[in-house]
Protein backbone atom coordinates (compact mmCIF):
# COMPACT_ATOMS: atom_id res chain seq x y z
CA UNK A 1 0.00 0.00 0.00
CA UNK A 2 2.82 2.32 0.81
CA UNK A 3 4.53 1.54 -2.53
CA UNK A 4 1.35 2.32 -4.42
CA UNK A 5 1.13 5.73 -2.80
CA UNK A 6 4.73 6.51 -3.74
CA UNK A 7 4.07 5.57 -7.37
CA UNK A 8 0.97 7.78 -7.52
CA UNK A 9 2.93 10.68 -6.06
CA UNK A 10 5.68 10.32 -8.69
CA UNK A 11 3.13 10.24 -11.51
CA UNK A 12 1.44 13.37 -10.18
CA UNK A 13 4.74 15.24 -9.99
CA UNK A 14 5.93 14.18 -13.49
CA UNK A 15 2.68 14.99 -15.33
CA UNK A 16 3.21 18.82 -15.47
CA UNK A 17 6.79 18.37 -16.71
CA UNK A 18 5.62 16.08 -19.53
CA UNK A 19 2.95 18.61 -20.53
CA UNK A 20 5.55 21.41 -20.82
CA UNK A 21 7.92 19.20 -22.84
CA UNK A 22 5.18 18.21 -25.29
CA UNK A 23 4.18 21.87 -25.78
CA UNK A 24 7.76 22.89 -26.54
CA UNK A 25 8.18 20.02 -29.00
CA UNK A 26 4.97 20.96 -30.81
CA UNK A 27 6.05 24.62 -31.04
CA UNK A 28 9.50 23.77 -32.41
CA UNK A 29 8.07 21.41 -35.03
CA UNK A 30 5.57 24.00 -36.29
CA UNK A 31 8.03 26.93 -36.60
CA UNK A 32 9.89 25.76 -39.80
CA UNK A 33 6.60 25.71 -41.70
CA UNK A 34 6.19 29.48 -41.32
CA UNK A 35 9.28 30.44 -43.41
CA UNK A 36 8.29 27.86 -46.01
CA UNK A 37 4.84 29.44 -46.26
CA UNK A 38 6.42 32.92 -46.47
CA UNK A 39 8.80 31.83 -49.22
CA UNK A 40 6.01 30.37 -51.36
CA UNK A 41 4.39 33.74 -52.40
CA UNK A 42 7.83 35.20 -53.17
CA UNK A 43 8.59 32.27 -55.46
CA UNK A 44 5.23 32.65 -57.21
CA UNK A 45 5.85 36.41 -57.71
CA UNK A 46 9.27 35.80 -59.27
CA UNK A 47 7.73 33.22 -61.60
CA UNK A 48 5.05 35.67 -62.76
CA UNK A 49 7.69 38.35 -63.42
CA UNK A 50 9.75 35.87 -65.42
CA UNK A 51 6.75 34.93 -67.59
CA UNK A 52 5.88 38.58 -68.21
CA UNK A 53 9.49 39.33 -69.16
CA UNK A 54 9.49 36.47 -71.68
CA UNK A 55 6.22 37.66 -73.21
CA UNK A 56 7.56 41.21 -73.48
CA UNK A 57 10.81 39.97 -75.06
CA UNK A 58 8.92 37.90 -77.66
CA UNK A 59 6.68 40.86 -78.48
CA UNK A 60 9.73 43.10 -78.96
CA UNK A 61 11.37 40.46 -81.18
CA UNK A 62 8.27 40.30 -83.40
CA UNK A 63 8.16 44.09 -83.61
CA UNK A 64 11.86 44.30 -84.55
CA UNK A 65 11.41 41.60 -87.19
CA UNK A 66 8.42 43.45 -88.72
CA UNK A 67 10.38 46.73 -88.82
CA UNK A 68 13.33 44.96 -90.45
CA UNK A 69 11.04 43.35 -93.04
CA UNK A 70 9.44 46.70 -93.95
CA UNK A 71 12.55 48.90 -94.09
CA UNK A 72 15.45 46.62 -95.01
CA UNK A 73 15.01 47.41 -98.71
CA UNK A 74 17.66 48.89 -100.96
CA UNK A 75 15.37 51.14 -103.02
CA UNK A 76 12.09 52.99 -102.62
CA UNK A 77 10.28 54.43 -105.66
CA UNK A 78 7.30 56.77 -105.37
CA UNK A 79 4.74 58.49 -107.60
CA UNK A 80 2.61 61.35 -106.27
CA UNK A 81 0.30 64.19 -107.13
CA UNK A 82 0.71 67.51 -105.37
CA UNK A 83 -0.42 71.03 -104.63
CA UNK A 84 1.59 74.23 -104.07
CA UNK A 85 0.83 77.89 -103.39
CA UNK A 86 3.24 79.85 -105.62
CA UNK A 87 3.92 83.52 -106.37
CA UNK A 88 3.97 83.63 -110.22
CA UNK A 89 5.49 87.09 -110.54
CA UNK A 90 6.20 90.45 -108.92
CA UNK A 91 3.49 92.36 -110.77
CA UNK A 92 3.78 94.83 -113.65
CA UNK A 93 6.69 97.22 -113.01
CA UNK A 94 6.43 100.98 -113.41
CA UNK A 95 7.13 102.03 -117.00
CA UNK A 96 7.55 105.72 -117.86
CA UNK A 97 4.72 107.67 -116.35
CA UNK A 98 2.66 104.53 -115.76
CA UNK A 99 2.69 103.39 -112.12
CA UNK A 100 3.57 99.87 -111.08
CA UNK A 101 0.76 97.37 -111.08
CA UNK A 102 -0.39 95.41 -108.03
CA UNK A 103 1.51 92.33 -106.92
CA UNK A 104 0.17 89.14 -108.43
CA UNK A 105 -1.89 86.81 -106.32
CA UNK A 106 -0.51 83.43 -105.37
CA UNK A 107 -1.47 80.72 -107.83
CA UNK A 108 -2.83 77.28 -106.97
CA UNK A 109 -0.32 74.99 -108.66
CA UNK A 110 -0.96 71.29 -109.24
CA UNK A 111 1.93 68.90 -109.59
CA UNK A 112 3.17 65.45 -110.43
CA UNK A 113 6.15 64.17 -108.49
CA UNK A 114 8.24 61.02 -108.85
CA UNK A 115 11.48 59.88 -107.30
CA UNK A 116 13.78 57.10 -106.19
CA UNK A 117 15.57 56.73 -102.84
CA UNK A 118 18.66 54.55 -102.45
CA UNK A 119 18.95 53.46 -98.80
CA UNK A 120 22.31 52.73 -97.17
CA UNK A 121 20.70 51.56 -93.91
CA UNK A 122 17.15 51.15 -92.65
CA UNK A 123 17.14 54.87 -91.83
CA UNK A 124 19.47 56.80 -94.17
CA UNK A 125 19.15 57.17 -97.93
CA UNK A 126 19.69 59.56 -100.86
CA UNK A 127 16.69 60.68 -102.95
CA UNK A 128 16.61 61.77 -106.60
CA UNK A 129 13.36 63.61 -107.38
CA UNK A 130 11.71 64.97 -110.53
CA UNK A 131 8.52 67.03 -110.63
CA UNK A 132 6.34 69.28 -112.76
CA UNK A 133 4.06 72.17 -111.72
CA UNK A 134 1.11 73.52 -113.72
CA UNK A 135 -1.27 76.42 -113.09
CA UNK A 136 -2.99 79.47 -114.50
CA UNK A 137 -1.88 82.83 -113.10
CA UNK A 138 -4.36 85.63 -112.64
CA UNK A 139 -2.73 88.79 -114.08
CA UNK A 140 -5.72 91.16 -113.69
CA UNK A 141 -7.56 92.87 -116.53
CA UNK A 142 -5.28 94.44 -119.13
CA UNK A 143 -5.25 95.86 -122.64
CA UNK A 144 -4.11 92.52 -124.07
CA UNK A 145 -7.26 90.64 -122.97
CA UNK A 146 -5.12 87.90 -121.38
CA UNK A 147 -6.06 87.43 -117.74
CA UNK A 148 -5.23 83.79 -116.87
CA UNK A 149 -2.19 82.59 -118.83
CA UNK A 150 -0.92 79.07 -118.25
CA UNK A 151 2.43 78.68 -116.50
CA UNK A 152 4.57 75.61 -115.86
CA UNK A 153 7.72 74.63 -114.01
CA UNK A 154 9.95 71.54 -114.03
CA UNK A 155 12.42 70.72 -111.26
CA UNK A 156 15.15 68.16 -110.58
CA UNK A 157 16.33 67.72 -106.99
CA UNK A 158 18.64 65.48 -104.95
CA UNK A 159 19.33 65.15 -101.24
CA UNK A 160 19.35 62.97 -98.10
CA UNK A 161 16.35 61.26 -96.52
CA UNK A 162 16.40 60.05 -92.92
CA UNK A 163 13.74 57.95 -91.18
CA UNK A 164 13.75 59.24 -87.63
CA UNK A 165 10.68 57.29 -86.44
CA UNK A 166 9.85 53.74 -87.55
CA UNK A 167 7.01 51.40 -86.64
CA UNK A 168 5.90 48.22 -88.45
CA UNK A 169 2.89 50.04 -89.98
CA UNK A 170 4.17 53.58 -90.47
CA UNK A 171 7.26 55.80 -90.51
CA UNK A 172 8.13 59.50 -90.33
CA UNK A 173 11.15 60.88 -92.19
CA UNK A 174 12.95 64.14 -92.80
CA UNK A 175 14.16 65.11 -96.27
CA UNK A 176 16.23 68.02 -97.61
CA UNK A 177 16.91 68.43 -101.35
CA UNK A 178 18.45 70.99 -103.64
CA UNK A 179 18.69 71.39 -107.41
CA UNK A 180 17.37 73.47 -110.29
CA UNK A 181 14.00 74.48 -111.69
CA UNK A 182 12.97 75.64 -115.16
CA UNK A 183 10.06 78.08 -115.41
CA UNK A 184 7.92 78.60 -118.50
CA UNK A 185 5.74 81.69 -117.95
CA UNK A 186 5.20 82.75 -121.58
CA UNK A 187 3.36 79.67 -122.83
CA UNK A 188 0.05 81.47 -123.49
CA UNK A 189 1.43 84.94 -124.26
CA UNK A 190 2.26 84.62 -127.94
CA UNK A 191 4.67 87.41 -128.88
CA UNK A 192 4.22 89.23 -125.56
CA UNK A 193 6.79 89.16 -122.78
CA UNK A 194 6.00 87.78 -119.29
CA UNK A 195 7.07 91.09 -117.72
CA UNK A 196 4.20 92.86 -119.50
CA UNK A 197 1.83 90.82 -117.33
CA UNK A 198 3.88 90.96 -114.14
CA UNK A 199 5.12 87.35 -114.48
CA UNK A 200 8.63 86.02 -113.89
CA UNK A 201 10.81 85.72 -117.00
CA UNK A 202 11.33 82.28 -118.53
CA UNK A 203 14.52 80.57 -117.40
CA UNK A 204 16.37 78.33 -114.99
CA UNK A 205 17.14 79.01 -111.35
CA UNK A 206 17.94 77.21 -108.11
CA UNK A 207 15.38 75.31 -106.06
CA UNK A 208 15.31 73.65 -102.64
CA UNK A 209 12.84 71.55 -100.70
CA UNK A 210 12.41 70.69 -97.01
CA UNK A 211 9.75 68.08 -96.27
CA UNK A 212 8.51 65.48 -93.78
CA UNK A 213 7.39 62.29 -95.58
CA UNK A 214 4.87 60.26 -93.58
CA UNK A 215 4.23 56.72 -94.86
CA UNK A 216 1.60 54.14 -93.93
CA UNK A 217 2.51 50.59 -94.92
CA UNK A 218 -0.18 48.53 -96.65
CA UNK A 219 2.33 45.67 -96.99
CA UNK A 220 6.07 45.44 -96.23
CA UNK A 221 6.69 46.61 -99.83
CA UNK A 222 3.85 49.02 -100.60
CA UNK A 223 2.94 52.20 -98.75
CA UNK A 224 0.76 55.30 -98.97
CA UNK A 225 2.61 58.57 -98.34
CA UNK A 226 1.75 62.19 -97.62
CA UNK A 227 4.55 64.75 -97.73
CA UNK A 228 4.03 68.30 -96.39
CA UNK A 229 6.68 70.52 -97.94
CA UNK A 230 8.38 73.90 -97.98
CA UNK A 231 9.64 74.76 -101.49
CA UNK A 232 12.11 77.54 -102.32
CA UNK A 233 12.85 78.91 -105.81
CA UNK A 234 14.77 81.90 -107.17
CA UNK A 235 12.99 83.37 -110.19
CA UNK A 236 13.60 87.01 -111.01
CA UNK A 237 16.70 87.26 -108.78
CA UNK A 238 14.39 87.01 -105.75
CA UNK A 239 13.18 84.10 -103.67
CA UNK A 240 9.74 82.52 -103.67
CA UNK A 241 8.70 80.77 -100.46
CA UNK A 242 5.97 78.25 -101.17
CA UNK A 243 4.07 75.72 -99.07
CA UNK A 244 2.37 72.60 -100.33
CA UNK A 245 2.15 68.83 -100.14
CA UNK A 246 2.21 65.67 -102.23
CA UNK A 247 0.11 62.51 -101.86
CA UNK A 248 0.95 59.20 -103.50
CA UNK A 249 2.15 55.61 -103.27
CA UNK A 250 5.58 54.08 -102.72
CA UNK A 251 7.13 50.73 -103.60
CA UNK A 252 10.17 49.30 -101.81
CA UNK A 253 12.35 46.62 -103.41
CA UNK A 254 15.81 45.03 -103.24
CA UNK A 255 17.59 43.84 -100.11
CA UNK A 256 20.39 45.64 -98.29
Language-model segments: residues:
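Residue-level signature of outer-membrane beta-barrel architecture
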Residues: 81-83, 118, 162-164, 214-216, ...
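Outer-membrane beta-barrel "beta-signal"
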Residues: 241-256
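Short glycine/proline- and aromatic-enriched beta-strand/turn motifs that initiate or cap beta-hairpins
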Residues: 24-117
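Outer-membrane beta-barrel translocator domains and adjoining extracellular loop/strand segments
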Residues: 89-100, 138-145, 185-195, 236-243
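Residues that define the transmembrane beta-barrel architecture of outer-membrane proteins
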Residues: 73, 106-112, 150-156, 170, ...
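Transmembrane beta-strands of outer-membrane beta-barrel pores
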Residues: 81-87, 130-136, 178-184, 230-234, ...
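Gram-negative (and chloroplast) outer-membrane scaffold detector with strong preference
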Residues: 76, 117-118, 122-193
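Repeated loop/turn-to-beta-strand initiation elements of outer-membrane beta-barrel proteins
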Residues: 123-128, 167-170, 216-224, 255-256
Amino acid sequence: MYSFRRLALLLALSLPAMTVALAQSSSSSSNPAAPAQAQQPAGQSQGQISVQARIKARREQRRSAAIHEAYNHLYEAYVSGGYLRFQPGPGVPAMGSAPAGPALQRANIYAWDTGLTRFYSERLGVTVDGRGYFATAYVYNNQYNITNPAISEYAGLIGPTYRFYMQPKYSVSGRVMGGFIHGKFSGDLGSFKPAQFGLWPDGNTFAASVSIPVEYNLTPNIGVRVVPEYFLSGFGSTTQNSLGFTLGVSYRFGQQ
